[in-house]
């Protein structure tokens, strides 16, 4: 669920939550067009692709719950899933949260609410 993804982000980045990434660049949040603006935006593009694959399998990223734990160095990992959808959605969120952690130095306040500036145009990269 988005609430669980928010927890993952808070654990991995320490200072940020889902709100900091919900309208960042051209691919974080509801907007999915144009080229990603930086490595964090690429994290979101990858998560979008992952969610699309899960949705094509009948899974719902908004309602699917899952369990995860925190490893050393603030890395999150999914726990053993009870079904395919739980596994797929958790892994999508796990990869994105760990990607945010890895690319946190790239976070640029300029790219918050960026899509509202009309800068995200053109085709999006393939998955």
From Swiss-Prot:
> What PROSITE patterns does the record point to?
PA2_ASP
Q: List the disulfide bonds.
A: 26-120, 28-44, 43-99, 49-127, 50-92, 59-85, 78-90
Q: In which tissues is it expressed?
A: Otoconial membrane in the maculae of the saccule and utricle. Otoconia are composites of proteins and inorganic crystals formed in the peripheral portion of the vestibular system of vertebrates. The otoconial membranes contain small crystals of calcium carbonate known as otoliths (ear stones) if there is a single deposit or as otoconia (ear dust) if there are many. Each mineral polymorph of otoconia has a protein unique to that polymorph.
Alphabetical list of InterPro entries matching this protein: PLipase_A2, PLipase_A2_Asp_AS, PLipase_A2_dom, PLipase_A2_dom_sf
UniProt keyword Disulfide bond, yes or no? yes
Residues with an annotated glycan are 20, 113
Subcellular location as annotated: Secreted
Query: Biological process (GO) annotations?
Result: arachidonate secretion; lipid catabolic process; phosphatidylcholine metabolic process; phosphatidylglycerol metabolic process
Query: Which GO molecular function terms does the record list?
Result: calcium ion binding; calcium-dependent phospholipase A2 activity; phospholipid binding
| Entry keywords, A to Z | Disulfide bond, Glycoprotein, Secreted
Listed GO CC annotations: extracellular region
What SUPFAM superfamilies does UniProt report for this protein, alphabetically? Phospholipase A2, PLA2
Classify the main location.
Answer: secreted
Instruction: Please give the subunit comment from the record.
Output: Monomer.
Q: What does this protein do?
A: Major protein of the aragonitic otoconia. It is unlikely that this protein has phospholipase A2 activity.
PANTHER family to which the protein is assigned, alphabetical:
PHOSPHOLIPASE A2 FAMILY MEMBER (PTHR11716), PHOSPHOLIPASE A2 HOMOLOG OTOCONIN-22 (PTHR11716:SF6)
Q: Which family, according to the similarity comment?
A: Belongs to the phospholipase A2 family.
Q: What is this protein called?
A: Phospholipase A2 homolog otoconin-22
Q: What is the organism field in this record?
A: Xenopus laevis (African clawed frog)
């Amino acid at each position: 669920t988005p609430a669980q993804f928010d927890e993952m982000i808070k654990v991995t980045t320490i200072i940020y939550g889902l709100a900091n990434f919900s309208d960042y660049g051209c691919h974080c949040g509801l907007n999915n067009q144009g080229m990603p603006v930086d490595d964090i935006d690429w994290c979101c593009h990858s998560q979008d692709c992952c969610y699309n694959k899960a949705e094509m399998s009948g899974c719902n990223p908004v309602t699917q719950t899952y369990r995860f734990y925190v490893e050393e160095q603030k890395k999150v990992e999914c726990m053993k899933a009870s079904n395919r959808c739980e596994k797929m959605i958790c892994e999508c969120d796990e990869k994105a949260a760990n990607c945010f952690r890895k690319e946190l130095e790239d976070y640029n306040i300029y790219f918050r609410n960026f899509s509202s500036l009309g800068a995200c145009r053109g085709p999006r990269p393939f998955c």
